[in-house]
């Protein structure tokens, strides 16, 4: 059976929202999963959705956690993911790095206490 990317995106967003994620965070998660699938990296794509939901349901991962900065030296900083979804925490870290790189010329961030962040190439492309 074949599905369109859009139908998978909509389905995945509904599943993630039902698990407790905000619409915006669910969209971020699905962008990451589908980005991976569309590049042939299936083991980091939609196949992971059920596992992510299970971890939320079991209380292993927070569907709503937002990162906090725990160390800040300007261009270099650390974030605590507060046990949140890796895709949303990873996206927040990358966006913060981009903002800081514009200011400092370069930026580096470490993240701890977050779940699997998915397909790494998603953040670089």
Residue ranges and their predicted role:
Residues 1-19:
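Generic N-terminal amphipathic, Lys/Arg-enriched alpha-helix
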Residues 12, 97, 122-123:
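Aromatic/hydrophobic pocket-lining residues that form π-stacking "cages" and hydrophobic walls in ligand
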Residues 17-20, 35-42:
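N-terminal and secondary-structure boundary signal
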Residues 23-34:
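Short, well-structured alpha-helical segments
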Residues 26-28, 98-103:
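Glycine-rich phosphate/diphosphate-binding loops that line cofactor/substrate pockets in enzymes
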Residues 30, 106-125:
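Glycine-rich anion/phosphate-binding loop at the beta-strand->alpha-helix junction
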Residues 34, 42, 77-80, 107-110:
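Short, conserved beta-strand segments within well-ordered enzyme catalytic domains
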Residues 45-100:
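Active-site cofactor/substrate anionic-group-binding motifs, chiefly glycine-
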């Amino acid at each position: 059976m074949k599905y369109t990317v859009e139908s998978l995106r909509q389905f995945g967003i509904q599943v993630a929202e039902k698990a407790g994620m905000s619409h915006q965070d669910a969209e971020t998660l699905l962008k990451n999963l589908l980005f991976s699938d569309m590049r042939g990296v299936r083991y980091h794509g939609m196949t992971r959705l059920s596992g992510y939901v299970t971890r939320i349901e079991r209380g292993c991962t927070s569907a709503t956690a937002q990162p906090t900065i725990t160390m800040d030296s300007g261009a270099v900083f650390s974030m605590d993911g507060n046990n949140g979804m890796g895709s949303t925490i990873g996206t927040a870290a990358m966006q913060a790095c981009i903002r800081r790189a514009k200011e400092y010329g370069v930026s580096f961030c470490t993240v701890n206490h977050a779940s699997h962040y998915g397909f790494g190439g998603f953040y670089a492309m």
